[in-house]
Amino acid sequence: NQTPLPMVMNILLWSVLGILGSFSVAWFGMRINTYANARTAFASLKGKAFPVMSLPLRSGMSIGVLLICVELVMMIIILLFIPRENAGACFIGFAIGESLGASALRICGGIFTKIADIGADLMKIIFKIDEDDARNPGVIADCTGDNAGDSVGPTADGFETYGVTGVALISFIVLAAGMSYTDNGSLALMADGIDIQARLIVWIFTMRLLMIITSVVSYMINNWFSKLRFGNKQDFDFEVPLTSLVWITSLLSIAVTFGVSYVMIGGMGEDLWWKLSVII
């Protein structure tokens, strides 16, 4: 049996959207990091340590929240507007597209960085100009390469990883949840299998949305406390606010996970709500 042409084109469309999504968030990440680097350098001239810590953290939060929101919106569009018989293939196409885009960006960023390093070294050897000398054009190329390798690649990787794991979870639910073994040993959908699968998929997307909210709220709380504590200090240990951010985010996310899971899937039996909460 041949796959209908409209379905093939739909899958290809979502593959292209996955590639464009990876490229878009990578561009945004590089743009934000460039601004953050410049503003952090100027903020350091004031002699205050807190802005030097808070600006990079804020830029990282903006990149992370944006790429997750874009990913989540695109997956919800597939879930809501693509017919059930085509949604699975579109999810796979989307995951393949963003993986291809992330791979290309990661490789290209690394190659650009290495070429810039080699160029700077050649200038040092041939023209006796140090690799960190402002007269060496490899210095600018190396800075650009580092920005490409450290911004473009990780941002696209984050976008791809978040999407691929979501597709894997949905695939597992569709293929395994709500299924039972028949007398001949084969798997078959239970009477309420569709309802179980739907509830679990809604639960997954709800948890993903709530984790964005808990992350932003945790960042705002930690930033407020850190500013009160370190705002006027000339120097402090940068690991302290970062560690407190990890603790606040973890505790808040765990509490929200268990509470919302109990409300949404608490009646599914076999204490499934707390088992899934522990897993995620």
What are these regions (language model features)?
Residues 1-280:
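Hydrophobic packing and interface segments
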